Amino acid sequence: MDFLIVLKALMMGLVEGFTEFLPISSTGHLIVFGNLIGFHSNHKVFEIAIQLGAVLAVVFEYRQRFSNVLHGVGKDRKANRFVLNLAIAFIPAAVMGLLFDKQIKEYLFNPLSVAVMLVLGGFFILWVEKRQSRAEPKIADVDALRPIDALMIGVAQVFALVPGTSRSGSTVMGGMFWGIERKTATEFSFFLAVPMMVAATAYDVLKHYRFFTLHDVGLILIGFIAAFVSGLVAVKALLKFVSKKNYIPFAYYRIVFGIVIIILWLSGWISWE
């Protein structure tokens, strides 16, 4: 394999892992970064691999929690409620995604939509953070979440179907808006990423498996490992960060990044193929 291509695959995996769980849109970063470094591998298959690497980072980080839940389902009330909440939160975006996947990719997968959603999302984060600073959150533990809380987070996740919104951003801010404490909303967003991204990966595999070739295996493995490692670092770092600080820095970053996308697009530095 060409060293430069390997380096680019490594960089793309790192970008996916670092941005997937931050409220800054991994999709926007992958497209912009991919264009800037000229990475043109078997795009969809590679994207599936690095997304899977990122989600497995969450599974690894919370392996004890998931193990306890799996062993406790049907026997333990706490485990049953956890699974029920994940299922409830999963359904809205899954249904809407299946119904409108084609339309979303046809009409909203463009630089302007991504940039606008990044900027709007940034202002929404600022508003939600200001709102929560004025009132004590009602829920401060994932195990205290009720089905209605999970449903509200699931409804918020629907907005993440629009590129540039950010799945983690919509679920965390949706939870905080509903009165869930910042770190609790962040943890539940991590947990919800597992069924959501596994389902999305399975769906994409069924649609694009015929494009997979043995020639791509090396690059896919490199991207997968890079996304797993960087995703693990991002999850640990974000939890530590939100334990002491808020999401306001990410809000300003989104606003600036959205403007940068417009500038790069208008100047011809990035395309959307």
UniProtKB/Swiss-Prot annotation:
UniProt entry keywords in alphabetical sequence: Antibiotic resistance, Cell inner membrane, Cell membrane, Cell shape, Cell wall biogenesis/degradation, Hydrolase, Membrane, Peptidoglycan synthesis, Transmembrane, Transmembrane helix
Name used for this protein in its record: Undecaprenyl-diphosphatase
Similarity field: Belongs to the UppP family.
Note in the entry: Bacitracin is thought to be involved in the inhibition of peptidoglycan synthesis by sequestering undecaprenyl diphosphate, thereby reducing the pool of lipid carrier available.
GO molecular function: undecaprenyl-diphosphatase activity
GO CC terms of this entry: plasma membrane
Transmembrane segments: 13-35, 45-62, 82-102, 108-128, 186-206, 219-239, 250-270
The keyword Oxidoreductase belongs to this UniProt entry's keyword annotation: no
Any Pfam family: BacA
Enzyme superclass (EC): hydrolase
Organism expressing this protein natively: Neisseria gonorrhoeae (strain NCCP11945)
Predominant location category: membrane
Record carries keyword Cell cycle: no
